[in-house]
Amino acid sequence: PQLHMPSRRQRQMFIRDRSDSMHVATFQFQNSFIDETIDSIGFRIRGNTSRGSAKKSFKVDFNHFIRGRNFYNLEKLNLNGEHNDPSIVRSKLCWDFYQDIGMKSSRASHVTLYVNNEYFGLYLSVEHIDDTFISKNFDNDNGNLWKCIWPADLTFRGQYPEDYHPYYSETRPYDLKTNRDLYDYSKLARLIRIIHNTPDSLEAVLDIKTTLQYLAMNILTGSWDDYRFLRNNFYLYHNPDNDLIHWIPYDYDNTFGIDWFDID
């Protein structure tokens, strides 16, 4: 894709690379089938440790400034620089594996990125996990979706839902992404309570198949920045139709022998 924005805004974005503030930009996408331009999209730097890298990753938000708008059924798009992977194929292989086994996961493809006519490099375009993703992958999209990042260890903290609300000012281990007006953590609290008190009852609240697929895939790909090792990088979705929580994979740059300190 091509992104165009005022040069002053671009400089501000790179100076304040830890900010999640969206900047107005024009998005142009062209391939063998599509040649479209969208004005007034949101554009910002994204990521955690990757924000400190020379090759930044970016988030595109098609409806941030103009509500209700999407681009081929996508409201948001992650453009990942894969800064510590010289091959830029590790994450793509992981997402392809998940697609091959039929697990609900992000779609991904390689793209070239230009910002203000400057070539930024080869990137991996990864589908954002949000309410749009849920509506495409589940018959019932009215459930709660949690983004789980460090320290999302599923440790028992108490019997009440509010015990699992974000508990550090800078840390949100279980970040509710849908139905925020209700702020209901009861299904998450129920899952954690059963994990620690009556694990023989897990099948009644957790989709065991997708959980085992997730764990097996992380072992296969050598993913260590995950729930199993770092209590990090996964989503949980409660499906009201079957009253089960489903595991959704997330973030696969640290796989196949890659660590934080590799090539930038």
Predicted regions mapped to residue ranges:
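Conserved NTP-binding catalytic cores of kinases and kinase-like/nucleotidyltransferase enzymes
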Residues: 12, 16-89, 93
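Short, well-structured beta-strand/strand-turn elements
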Residues: 101-112, 226
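Structural motif
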Residues: 15, 115-116
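Active-site acidic catalytic loop and adjacent metal/ATP-binding pocket
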Residues: 10, 60, 204-258
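Hydrophobic, secondary-structure "cap" segments at the distal end of domains
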Residues: 258-264
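Single conserved hydrophobic/aromatic residue that forms the stacking wall/gate
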Residues: 1-11, 15
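Internal "kinase-insert"/substrate-recognition segments embedded within catalytic cores
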Residues: 59-67, 81-82, 101-106, 118-221
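Carboxylate/His-rich catalytic cores and anion/metal-binding grooves
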Residues: 35-42, 114-115, 136, 140-143, ...
